[in-house]
């Protein structure tokens, strides 16, 4: 409150100042002959603008006309009590972002058709294509029960029924065996791991081979709410719900209907290597699609999937109620959860899948605090601003229960006190349309919400609690201190009201106690440059009388008359010189004037000191406050990395790893359509094909005939080879080889015998005949003549036979002979005949025809005896 005097107060002060200072000025003028000069103090208010007592001023209180005040002696301190806190168990449930994961079995038959070219040194695959076909139910049962299948597949393609046999053989039972894999979530069983790519043995021919492989894939599938489709681990998307319709035989939703779908009850799927008797019977869906079949366990949505999942549970949580919200905190996490005051209606009906789990978790948490706390009412459910659900079970301390029971003489120590609020089993019904994140809304928009708001809320709650605690203590201490200060000022005002009121107002004022109130008026500032202090403190004309404070001279602002007074405390000028005392010996005095301190010894000025050279006595009491404790924020994972990885129905990592591993480990030859062109393996066939194409229809006929012949011989050779591959044919081949070896050995032995003794081999009994009596062998000359005669006889018979055959063939000349004779005649005519003419045969023997050419020595002219030809010069 500002204090200001009226015009009358100012006028009175001026009059009083003029009357008092007029006589003093005359005395000051009379003292100008004193040997001690005066000292003019320095007043620089700008050096310390925070100190309002530096300027020289004149203060005087008027008994009337000033402002009057009184001190308040009755004060009430404000109430700083905090909000109500309730202990309890808190279970926090979050939205389940992990899709529904279940096991499926995929069945298919893979037909691979491979065309191989048989080259001279290398073989080449010129074409290869693979098709996948669905497996019917009767064969799927063989796969699920016994891990067997048929090695053939019969399909209807373009209106034609085609049958493919594995290894181009016949239909037989094949056994499934585990295949190599990379990921543990996918297991394959197959019947034929190798591609049939063996060419025929006929060179420069093409062969088509067929491979049929039965494959069963055990893997997982995923479906996300609203469960309109699901995706397998290998990337197949099935546009239907995986769940069974309530009281139905089909899935809940079917966006694209398969070729057929059946519900199989009490269907057993055995494990590999385990008998059918140990399989568990279950209800399964079986669907046939375009190129594969699929089966999975049929369950309802309510029994298999839940929209909420437990995140964290706390047995020592605190609930704080504010004006429009509830705050839940726990020491285990640095987060505070804010919820409306209203409870969630029909939570146990909306989320039946977790309600039983909620009761079990509450019982587990109760066991942790059963020695100190008891339940206080039933569980309540609240929904946070981050789409989390808090199941709250209030607790009460056992000591409070016992005290309350003794107070009201209750026999049951576990009864809840009537003053403690309990929860009624009946909850207020709310509009279910306002409840977001329900289990049957069909929307999957309730996903992960950032928990940063919860952490900020926790930090704010901790800061608010700490600050409110400090402010509460300060408020109470401040209130008590102010009350005590009022009492102290009231008592001090009776002694020196001016000092008390100046301290209270924070600026120089003049005060006077008039009864039970204090009259306050302002001070008047003087001309600061006109103020000077006397160095002599003795009263003139009186040797034993001295001033208690130095005498000063000053002028009022805009005034020319000089006034005298005494230097008061804190630069105040007293408008009188009546403050005197009996002079004392060996005394010192220090007085502050302006910004300096004057030292007087024996009432005479000695020196000037700076205010900073004199130490100060601190009477301030330091307020010791406990600062707000540090809070280290920790990242709270609402959803773990595993949950985030599983939140997508497409497991891209597993799909690509499995696909790459499966394609890179196929046992067989790779597809290579341009192999023959790039490497020149069948250039001859290509050239021959171009020639036949140029021939047109004739070329096609030749190619067809040649292809038929080659195919016939190829089939014969392949049949022979296939026969030898058969066990019976192989045994027969081994027997024939052994028989041939024996025959060759016998023939070689007989040949050596004939070479060593030909007569004995021809006539085995010749040796016995030579031993008979009367047998005499002929001479060697006779034997030689006989052999020569036999040789000539044999040669003559052979010559006669050849002559007879020539006579028979003479009139039957072939086309080749006619062409040869014609060509020979043309050549002879072009060369002029060479002077030769054909010899005529007159029926004589061969020797007679050439008799004129015989020489005297028995030879023939121009005849090469060894070669048997004549040099005719042609």
UniProtKB/Swiss-Prot annotation:
The gene is gB. Glycans are attached at residues 171, 247, 281, 302, 323, 348, 356, 376, 409, 412, 444, 558, 610, 624. Residues 116-122, 200-208 are annotated as: Involved in fusion and/or binding to host membrane. Residues 749-874 are intravirion. It is a single-pass type I membrane protein. A proteolytic cleavage by host furin generates two subunits that remain linked by disulfide bonds. Residues 1-25 form the signal peptide. Disulfide bonds join 59-523, 77-479, 149-214, 306-353, 546-583. GO terms for biological process: symbiont entry into host cell; virion attachment to host cell. The keyword Disulfide bond applies. It comes from the Viruses. A motif (Internalization motif) lies at residues 836-839. The record marks 427-428 as: Cleavage. It comes from Equine herpesvirus 2 (strain 86/87) (EHV-2). Homotrimer; disulfide-linked. Binds to heparan sulfate proteoglycans. Interacts with gH/gL heterodimer. This is Envelope glycoprotein B. Residues 26-727 are virion surface. It is found in: Virion membrane; Host cell membrane; Host endosome membrane; Host Golgi apparatus membrane. Residues 412-450, 830-874 are annotated as: Disordered. Belongs to the herpesviridae glycoprotein B family. Residues 673-725 are annotated as: Hydrophobic membrane proximal region.
